[in-house]
Amino acid sequence: TGLDSGWNSFSEEELKAFVDKCKANGQVAGVYWTPFTDWAKNPEREIKEMPGYKYKDVYLYANGKPQELDGAYAVDPTHPAIEAMMKHTSELFHRAGFEYVKMDFMTHGAMEADKWYNPEIQTGIQGYNYGMQLLDKYFGDMYINLSISPVFPAQYAQSRRIACDAWNKIKDTEYTLNALSYGWWQKYIYQFNDADHIVL
């Protein structure tokens, strides 16, 4: 059972209670996170996990402007403040007892930029791979499901969503069928395909 976006409005005790309820029902407790995004888009906001840094210090910039996609700013996967956030979030998830995490909006971590904190990184996919290695370091003992993510590199997760949300319009049906056209071969890349949701 996955606790989606909004889980951070709960206290640690409430998160633990959710996990305990799932276990009592014979279910595995899952949670959600977007490690490479800033939804607040507030450059002056301080990063609580690494005092001394503000969000403007970790954004990916292109032509001097923060990279924005789907309503969120992209952050630099190579910045030490992002690793500090990963460590902090991982520790919370582990203390609460979560065994599964859906990592969403992962494409933000693969966006191109003028530069990265780590000067050895020259492309968006290199930055993404660097960030995924860090995620593996902190979340590697959990079941990882990627969403809105590059197909490759694929070795850091057990599953990937073949597409995003689809609703009741014909364009959504077209979108879902298009996703299926490449979804069939992803079973050879990831252990499991995630179709997101199915209308019954």
What residue spans do the PLM features occupy?
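Glycan-recognition surfaces
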Residues: N42-A84, Y130-L200
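Aromatic-lined carbohydrate-binding/catalytic grooves of carbohydrate-active enzymes
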Residues: T1-E91, A96-E120
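Short acidic, glycine/proline-enriched helix-loop-strand junctions
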Residues: G109-M142
